[in-house]
Amino acid sequence: MSQTHLSNQKFADLPLHPEVKQALAENGFEFCTPIQALSLPVLLQSKDIAGQAQTGTGKTMAFLVATFNHLLSTPIPENRQLNQPRAIIMAPTRELAIQIAKDAILLAKHTHLKVGIVYGGESYDVQRKVLDQGVDILIGTTGRIIDYVRQGIISLNAIQAVVLDEADRMFDLGFIKDIRFLFRRMPNADQRLNMLFSATLSMKVQELAYDHMNDPVKVEIAPEEKTSKNIKEEIFYPSQEDKIRLLLTLIEEDWPEKAIVFSNTKHSCENLWSWLEGDGHRVGLLTGDVPQKKRIRILEQFTQGQLDILVATDVAARGLHISDVSHVYNYDLPDDCEDYVHRIGRTGRAGNKGVSVSFACEEYALNLPAIESYINHSIPVSNYDRDALLDDIPPPVKIHRKHPAGARNLRERSGAGRPQGAHRSGGRPPRHDRTRRQP
């Protein structure tokens, strides 16, 4: 983690429970990020917070540290039953819930607290067996949590800490009724520690906070900067017929270590995957139709470096927390301004540098003024030489519905795509030496 991303506040200097301090030290956490430095002193006084911070700022560890510390420092409720967790962490997507659980387990290893995770798309009975053994901290998506609550498998009567992560996405995905349903089944707000985090603290998010929290303290990290200074943004104005050639040329010349390509529709994503796969790239496809087990497998392949490029829609990519993404390509400009911020926020995390490349084509160019107004700056324009675009592109492959859109054994081709089994750090250089960016 880059030191430029950290504050001068040390975890060791905070009044944390000894077991939490030990867990942080053994996992290499010495200095707080800005959101941690601002939120933890408030939370350690048992005050609620509504925090605004961009993704990749360390907010997950902020609320996990506060949750573990609160449970370790607070007496267990009298007559607490085995099916009553003491803390609940709600996330908008399965992938985000899984990532939070992985981080929570790092802290749980040094405490007696048990962590459980529930989400849709996986075995109901397997997750229930974990709950039947009792958990202290329940992490999950609202739909599956509600299923277990309604069946009496879990009770929220002993909740002492609540986390609502990515609250703005909860609204986008229509989960607010579910959240209110769960809040109504917990002890009163003044009997628990409440934490809400969101990339944006819109009026509807603030209303939710004040309805279900106890006079929360508002914590903001650089709210005037909606995009990170670590991200180099640029935009092209390609014709519709040039778009795919331009994308393949940029990827060929940038040769990103790990890239996500966003498009606005499932059909467009499938088309992009076909072209990239045909060009020999190790590419995965994430749309709303991809089953959960396949999603997890594709994400693992991408995270572990077996895939270099991920093509995704906004809905399919929500909640993804993947480190070391070097490039984001907006093949289509999003219709929602906030989606632009969420998309490019997947690179340039934790103090690292990132690159965001956007296309303003005939169909979506009208979205640009609203996006630039929302982020409070103009995106630098880059031009390209049409004659310098790749002209030896292999045809797209057909999508085989019975096979995962993940890593496959790719055929070797002379002068096209990556050789089979090669990695970005050791693969071939771009097949053409050309300059596609012009002043």
Curated annotation (Swiss-Prot):
A motif (Q motif) lies at residues 9-37. Its EC number is 3.6.4.13. GO terms for cellular component: cytosol. SMART domains: DEXDc, HELICc. InterPro entries: DEAD/DEAH_box_helicase_dom, DEAD_box_RNA_helicase, Helicase_ATP-bd, Helicase_C-like, P-loop_NTPase, RNA-helicase_DEAD-box_CS, RNA_helicase_ATP-dep_RhlB, RNA_helicase_DEAD_Q_motif. It is found in: Cytoplasm. Keywords: ATP-binding, Cytoplasm, Helicase, Hydrolase, Nucleotide-binding, RNA-binding. Residues 243-390 form the Helicase C-terminal domain. GO terms for molecular function: ATP binding; ATP hydrolysis activity; RNA binding; RNA helicase activity. It comes from the Bacteria. Pfam families: DEAD, Helicase_C. ATP binds at residues 53-60. Its main location: cytoplasm. Residues 40-219 form the Helicase ATP-binding domain. One of its GO terms (biological process) is RNA catabolic process. Residues 425-439 have a biased composition (Basic residues). Gene3D superfamilies: P-loop containing nucleotide triphosphate hydrolases. A motif (DEAD box) lies at residues 165-168. It catalyses: ATP + H2O = ADP + phosphate + H(+). Residues 395-439 are annotated as: Disordered. DEAD-box RNA helicase involved in RNA degradation. Has RNA-dependent ATPase activity and unwinds double-stranded RNA. Belongs to the DEAD box helicase family. RhlB subfamily. Component of the RNA degradosome, which is a multiprotein complex involved in RNA processing and mRNA degradation. This is ATP-dependent RNA helicase RhlB. It comes from Shewanella sp. (strain MR-4). The gene is rhlB.
